[in-house]
């Protein structure tokens, strides 16, 4: 047993991989304490579990070894990266049902027939063994969940995911039916807390499944939807916050709502078979857009976060906003609702919804880094598609500065968040090409390092680069009507292609405007006739282009405001046939020289050692 516990401890202290599957990005030094405090009860329960299953090791151990060699391609959104299951860890076989045995055999047959690295199955084989570290972390997770200790729950939540990534890299997690017997008499089916824990574990099970499979089979999608329905129905049907005797850390609550929208987004992009279409036609409520939005609205309404006294949420114990789970779940549902609205192409409504959120530096969305990044990513994208380039630049610059500071102070290393950061740099590059504006110096340097060459091509009006960056950075937009209802051949009506075409059309309108800007910055006054000759276009066409440019110089300021303002580095007006230019270029060279002088003087300051 000591060997197993050491393995579990080592696994806990490795760096956290904060992908979409969950887990917290902070390192805690007290993780080992939880294991040591509860080791006695765990050893007794593990011994009972060993005695119960010691006669079932024959065929299933062989299946487990075959399963470990499967070539399951990981999802781009996350998933375990590595290799083989550790062989020196004590494990206990799982008594598979007949259906699970058939699934395992079918998976092995598929992997043998499809040796290509690009092969991607639509289902995972079941887990065939329970490993001792996983058992330890599961018991810790259950015990801490029952004790309602925020930090202990968060540590156990993080540790359990890491152990699952280590021991189940190419298969599904053990089902809750396999794990409940380990808890013994501790588990009470009549307890609200225990029943809700079962629902939460199932959500983790399906989240892990979606992370490893690009397009899960229809049965898994339906089961995951039904589990979310039970979770939300349990929370929404409560008559009083005192009836819900649970407390979850913010990171887990965010993962819960974020995964709900992710699975909806994934399902909306599915390429379905004929039998799946027939099934969904008879069950239209499965991952329906209206139902997804309705649940988010219901959670927001139930949480009462906007109807309560804004000065003190905890004004009454009878208010659901006084319950931390409802309060934060409602808040995260607002952000997820903004995400859904952006995916559907309703950017105006998304920006209107964001007016409900306090965007201050100490707002609640800053509690979870993934939430912070997601909010500003979709905020910047919504501003970009609404042609509010100045506001998009502000939003993207703000979050990129924040991410840079967190990466230094908190050892912020998350593949998923890093990919989102690269996408935000790409969106900022587009904004800088369409509406040049001043941004943070460090952000500007990083942008030039990542997309400097593409920015130059964008400024020359290269549409192919605009399309390339948009395809890379923009979320994959979806339609409100599922493909199986709108028809099988939906290529012409692809919402993502539609949004791309609208964006490129806007860029085409500004293709000549960039060239016009490069000329008028050289003059304080110039005649329309002369500028038309330089551009080799008709003077009347130039008047139209100048009017268009003047219109696109202006952006609505801020949220909820109707005031218009030009914050670009140049402005002009036309008086009869003369163009009068107000050139307000930032003195970037001057700032650079001043900063260099100050740094140089600082390096020359003598330091005296009086000792």
From Swiss-Prot:
Residues 391-588 form the PCI domain. Component of the eukaryotic translation initiation factor 3 (eIF-3) complex, which is involved in protein synthesis of a specialized repertoire of mRNAs and, together with other initiation factors, stimulates binding of mRNA and methionyl-tRNAi to the 40S ribosome. The eIF-3 complex specifically targets and initiates translation of a subset of mRNAs involved in cell proliferation. GO terms for molecular function: translation initiation factor activity. Residues 1-65 have a biased composition (Low complexity). Its main location: cytoplasm. InterPro entries: eIF3l, PCI_dom. Pfam families: Paf67. HAMAP family: eIF3l. Belongs to the eIF-3 subunit L family. The gene is eif3L. It comes from the Eukaryota. This is Eukaryotic translation initiation factor 3 subunit L. It is found in: Cytoplasm. GO terms for biological process: formation of cytoplasmic translation initiation complex; translational initiation. Component of the eukaryotic translation initiation factor 3 (eIF-3) complex.
